[in-house]
């Protein structure tokens, strides 16, 4: 037995190894071949499962396990790692589970009472003679311990006894049995049991061994059978080789060192696998496509791409997977289980790889660097997507329905749902369904109010990491997505994708009601509300409802007076960002929207569309009260207020109300005295631009008749 001090030292070494991330699952795993598994009884198998799961959970608790091994997924589903082959009876016979060697000893010879050292006990055991009745040969116990008496296909096998660790049990003096040593297959004598003395014939392949001294069989209950125990942590193992590997966790021993990079391993198999990184060796080749792999397990998984085999099916939704680990991870969508928790912030994840990626947020580690531009990423998948998007242009994943290609498999899967309409992720609070799991996660934060992502500059919080990343570009001015056609840059890749459809003319989203097509799905969703009349976003101040949340936000600024968008040229502020963009074209003189009929150019696209109706005569907006039609939606809205009498714009100074915001703006200038329109000839200022235009005719000499006809009688000069 190790001293308490040695145990503590071993524990410190284990903690140190784990803190350095040097322990892998394979370091603490217990491996059985199918043959070995069939030899284990029920108690041993149960113990194996318990130890394996405990080892794995210990690693996960300190974040040292990246992906879940298939064997753990099986054990969590209470399945065996091996299926017992039919027609084979390879397990131990219940009556022959253990073979014990003993000798009738008097009380004064009792080994326990004498407290003899292990060396003396071994000497006494070596003195016992055994005779093989078939071969007619005498055996010393010393020889017996060093030979394999029975081959692997028989009831029991005994191998070399290397040393005796402990004598642990004292028996009553009245017990007839002496001290007994368990000769187990893993070469340790661990326990002392009382046994009834008798002669025992051991039959194996028609061979019989009988002892001249006393040999007995102990009918030990299967559930109490002991395996090898680690003295440091008391974990149980079935093989000496597995125990030896396990003990290297406590000692930190890594005897197998790579001569290329100096990295050391606790197992030779791990070294051999690691060396393929340096040699580039990929000995396992796919016969279908020729792709090679460094590990056979990777080849087996890859081959399912060709066969389409998905042997692991979810019992909840019948979705099938090619890998057991993927099924186990998927099932957590249904259960909501998130067993992997970040020790820094407490955030939990459904798989340990997501936890590993998340922890890099805290550490700032970005181990995957692009060889073309030097940009670094936290995940290898992000690097692969980056290179395909910016450098190689590769889009290896094609949609079989429409032929559209994607840079990654996830993009293809998500795209396919636009064809199938599948929305497998359902909110358990409101029942809303989503095509992407990430969309469900973000949606659920509406119910919880959670905003875990905070800007370190302005402290604004967001419910989605992507929203924070996009927001931070407002501070940095970064626009990493540039159009190759016109050079225009964007903060978001989706904005670039939408913009590129201007050049391609692509409008992939079609309305099923009127067949109108759109370049963006969001525009289609907005359009469909015209048919449904849906206006789900209501103002709490005045009760006005809107079909889009952006319109509600913009409307609420009428009540708050907020104008967060300021022109850097003149300081004028606006309630909407689009208004600022349009206003800035006054300073730049830019008119990017040109009519193909007459060549007239406009600052706003909406103005061009409205103008084109002059050529076409189109009046798509009709009043449902009087039938009058309009070429502009805004004109219809203003007209309808004649019927309703609605005057939603009220002056805060005198409470006078107006049907149009422009009328309110003009009225406010009476109170403020503001006259923003100044004549460059004489300096006279006016509240309205139309008044300035009329005044300027005095200087140009235009007919006063025109002026008088244009103004009400009392305004004629």
Swiss-Prot record:
Entry's localization field: Nucleus
GO cellular component annotations of the record: nuclear body; nucleoplasm; nucleus
Superkingdom of source: Eukaryota
Motif (Nuclear localization signal): 216-219, 385-388
Any matching Pfam family: zf-C2H2
Domain KRAB: start-end pairs: 23-94
Segments traversing the membrane: none
Tissues expressing the protein: Highly expressed in testis. Very low expression in thymus. No expression in other tissues tested. Expressed in a differentiation stage-specific manner in mesenchymal chondrogenic progenitor cells.
Zinc finger annotations (C2H2-type) as residue ranges: 228-250, 256-278, 284-306, 312-334, 340-362, 368-391, 397-419, 425-447, 453-475, 481-503, 509-531, 537-559, 565-587, 593-615, 621-643, 649-671, 677-699
Function text: May be involved in transcriptional regulation.
Name listed for the protein in its UniProt record: Zinc finger protein 470
Source species: Homo sapiens (Human)
Gene behind the chain: ZNF470
